């Protein structure tokens, strides 16, 4: 199963609470921090919600 490397590239300051909570749930706390998550529908939904704030790379 593939994984996704997700990097927070824009600040969460001034963002709605739901976006901040989603980023926090994914483990993204500070700018330019990376997390590796499994490529599941749940993760894809979270990435879609934060698409304007994160960079996503597929890794194997």
Curated annotation (Swiss-Prot):
Which residues form each disulfide bond in the chain?
none
**Which GO MF term does the entry hold, naming one?**
structural constituent of ribosome
Task: Show the coiled coil region(s).
Answer: none
Biological process (GO), any one: translation
Q: Enumerate the UniProt keywords alphabetically.
A: Ribonucleoprotein, Ribosomal protein
A matching Pfam family: Ribosomal_L30
Q: Would you tell me the Gene Ontology cellular component terms?
A: cytosolic large ribosomal subunit
Q: Kindly indicate whether the keyword Ribonucleoprotein belongs to this entry.
A: yes
The source's superkingdom equals Bacteria
Q: Which family does it belong to?
A: Belongs to the universal ribosomal protein uL30 family.
PANTHER family membership = LARGE RIBOSOMAL SUBUNIT PROTEIN UL30M (PTHR15892:SF2), MITOCHONDRIAL RIBOSOMAL PROTEIN L30 (PTHR15892)
Describe, as the record does, how this protein assembles with itself and its partners: Part of the 50S ribosomal subunit.
This protein is called Large ribosomal subunit protein uL30
Which organism does this sequence originate in?
Answer: Moorella thermoacetica (strain ATCC 39073 / JCM 9320)
């Amino acid at each position: 199963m593939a994984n996704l490397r997700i990097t927070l590239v824009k600040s969460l300051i001034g963002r709605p609470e739901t976006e901040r909570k989603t980023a926090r749930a994914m483990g993204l706390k500070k700018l330019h921090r990376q997390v590796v998550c499994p490529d599941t529908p749940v993760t894809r939904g979270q990435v879609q919600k934060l698409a304007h704030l994160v960079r996503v790379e597929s890794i194997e």
